[in-house]
Amino acid sequence: MFSPFLKPAALATILLLIAGTASAQSRELRVCADPDNMPFSNIQQRGFENRIAELVARDLGAHLTYVWQRMGRGFVREYIDKSQCDLVIGVPANFRPLLTTIPYYRSSYVFVVPRQSNVKSVSLDSPELHGLKIGVQVLDENYTPPGTALARRGLQNEIVGFDTTGEDAESIVRAVAKHQVDLAVVWGPLAGYFARRYRGALKLMPVEPEVDPPGLPFTFAISMGVRKGNTALRNDLQNVLSTHSSQIHDILAEYGVPELPLAPQQTSISRGQ
């Protein structure tokens, strides 16, 4: 309660402090997230991207809210560009439809192989892949990069496609564990998270080469993305990523995300457009 005996200067200082506190508390961070996409996010907020979003909001003193939407074709236009949400926690670095932060982790596709398998080392060019059943992820009826690379090598008949969205996310890893396929090529964060459920029965090996000529990548650096032109929020996010890098990597490790080193230039903060 205000005292009637406060001097005007003191009263003005208190009012400014209250106004600043109210402004910080009123800031809202609206995150676009998939409601059923573990280990990344879900509506129960148990994914690692949910955890990272909480860390960001806490650092910014913002109230975290979610706009739940499957990250399909057109979501940037409908949700980010139309200001229904402010931020996507995980997009490829330099994702053109958005203004992206510095990357905060880098991962790769991995081979998921039974630990007792005769396959000791494997690459996309391994002759022993011929005649095996090879699981690959299918996205919107299209192959992910591993499927495309295998098809280029004449291995179309060996490919077994898996929809890994929603409740089927674990299906491709489970198929390896249950010997329904001989091995699978899976995006690292998904593979690492679900492989742990099989208590050492599976091993993960990075896909080689990292880039399939002439230019099909198997490793990706991951950034946060905001609406183009929103440099203020992008810069705030980059400060959070730099300040809390070790905490973010701890979260990723907790979820079994296989990480690769970021290139030094990828960790340099840019303040431009």
What do these predicted regions represent?
Residues 1-11:
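Bacterial N-terminal signal peptides that target proteins for export
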Residues 25-97, 165-166, 254-255:
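Extracytoplasmic small-molecule ligand-binding "clamshell" domains
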Residues 29-40, 124-145:
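Short loop->beta-strand "edge-of-pocket" segments that line small-molecule binding or catalytic clefts
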Residues 53-63, 104-106, 126-130, 141-167, ...:
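Ligand-binding cleft/hinge of the Venus flytrap
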Residues 74-75, 81, 89-99, 149, ...:
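A ligand-binding cleft/hinge motif common to bilobed small-molecule-binding domains
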